[in-house]
Amino acid sequence: MLQYHMIADGRVQGVGFRYFVQMEADRHKVAGWVKNRDDGRVEILAEGPEESLKQFAEAVRKGSPFSNVTGVTIEESHRLKGYRTFSISY
């Protein structure tokens, strides 16, 4: 099990990107949260098996139909918070 702390850049706010991230998290069976940042980027904390996180991260990089993801930074960690679900934080 790993944790990814991700920051997505580009047109990722006001386009349903957080909902898309939540759907992808459910599809890849990862837990954590997603939230908008004041700087226009989106922050994601995701935990799960390594292969699931890799597939999830690839989906985030591709983005939703209405988003335009220009970059995603990922910090990997073994310090898990123990999330059981994935939620949108406001």
From Swiss-Prot:
The active site is at residues 18, 36. Residues 3-90 form the Acylphosphatase-like domain. It comes from the Bacteria. GO terms for molecular function: acylphosphatase activity. Keywords: Hydrolase. Its EC number is 3.6.1.7. PANTHER family: ACYLPHOSPHATASE. This is Acylphosphatase. The gene is acyP.
